Amino acid sequence: MIFSTLEHILTHISFSVVSTVLPIYFFTFLVNLDEIIGFFDSSDKGIVITFFGITGLLFTRWIYSGHFPLSNLYESLIFLSWAFSIIHMVSYFNKKQKNYLNAITAPSAIFIQGFATSGLLNKMPQSAILVPALQSQWLMMHVSMMILGYGALLCGSLLSIALLVITFRKVVPPFWNENIKTKNLLNELFYFDVYYIKERNSILLQQNSNFSFSKNYYRSQLIEQLDFWSFRIISLGFIFLTVGILSESVWANETWGSYWNWDPKETWAFITWTIFAIYLHIKTNRNVRGIHSPIVDAIGFLLIWICYFGVNLLGIGLHSYGSFTSN
């Protein structure tokens, strides 16, 4: 009873704090109020409180249930929200410049936690005895790496999608201008790196001409930060996803006698891994660097949700123990 009450208190505290912080982040991000230092710092401290609240929630559930809290969809969503909070903490300690990563991590954490604590999953918060397939020491290793990988890849993909939107708004012609052909638009979209390098050089020239605070310069700095963080966060998420898939193979061999069973969850995880491997290849290989890598990220963003929720919605395969239909 005590653990259950404590769990509810921590859930409400973390959700209330992050709900209060979210409008502050959107306001400071859109209006660009750098002079309101205390206002922005207070929102950062709110996310720190949320991080410790979710951490306490997970530890409380761990002690109460007697196993690592990653046995169903509700617990994995809370852990995913915690993963976004960790990514936010990284940007919190980077005080050298204004970081737009916060505008992605804060709403992601609140939306995921809000969905987990909503009425859609009202039967799942109660902790239950693990099914035999999950009673293994590989549970913590495999599932935690996969969820951390999902969180990092989702965050990096959202940054790339934001980069894609900014680029699309720049190159898309007005609907009344018939002189600009669709082919030119597609060339701009699929060869973004070349376009970005040209614009950055142009902005540097403007900076030398005392136009460093112009609208184009501000936009260039935004694009540079989005590209910087998306590549590094996706690289980290790719490592987590790789370790998660490898640990799953070892666990599957111990449980079912086969390293790979082409289960729907395994298949979609492999497809997701392949897409982000292509993205990293594009970013690190100069010969194919002209391809618009954020488009690959956008595809990967959709694949992650298919991999994460697809099996749970269908309720099929070896990973159907945490599905909606099973509850």
From Swiss-Prot:
What keyword terms does UniProt attach to this protein?
Chloroplast, Cytochrome c-type biogenesis, Membrane, Plastid, Thylakoid, Transmembrane, Transmembrane helix
Instruction: Tell me if NAD is a UniProt keyword of this record.
Output: no
Gene Ontology MF term list: heme binding
Cellular component GO terms held in the UniProt record: chloroplast thylakoid membrane; plasma membrane
Q: Which GO terms describe its biological process?
A: cytochrome complex assembly
Q: Which InterPro entries match?
A: Cyt_c_assembly, Cyt_c_biogenesis_CcsA, Cyt_c_biogenesis_CcsA/CcmC
Q: Which residues cross the membrane?
A: 13-33, 46-66, 73-93, 101-121, 146-166, 226-246, 262-282, 298-318
Entry function: Required during biogenesis of c-type cytochromes (cytochrome c6 and cytochrome f) at the step of heme attachment.
Name the NCBIfam families on file.
cytochr_II_ccsB (TIGR03144)
Q: Which HAMAP family match?
A: CytC_CcsA
This one is known as Cytochrome c biogenesis protein CcsA
Taxonomic lineage is: Eukaryota, Viridiplantae, Streptophyta, Embryophyta, Tracheophyta
Question: What gene, per UniProt, encodes this protein?
Answer: ccsA
